[in-house]
């Protein structure tokens, strides 16, 4: 059984695209066409955040360190 309830992806030529991943606990990650994954502020547990990053890495080939650095820069929690 997977942690994520849905993966939604919208992609069109000559327009911006955005992908998002929602977990069963309500937390989510989103990624624009010109950015790396940006996590939301409602992190129920550190373990859930780590699992989310691992799942994103498997699907779009992001490194965990790049995702962690990006979440600090995205401004979602500020």
From Swiss-Prot:
Residues 1-32 are annotated as: Disordered. This is HssA/B-like protein 30. One of its GO terms (biological process) is sorocarp development. Belongs to the hssA/B family. Coiled coil: none annotated. Disulfide bonds: none annotated. InterPro entries: HssA/B-like_chaperone, HssA/B-related.
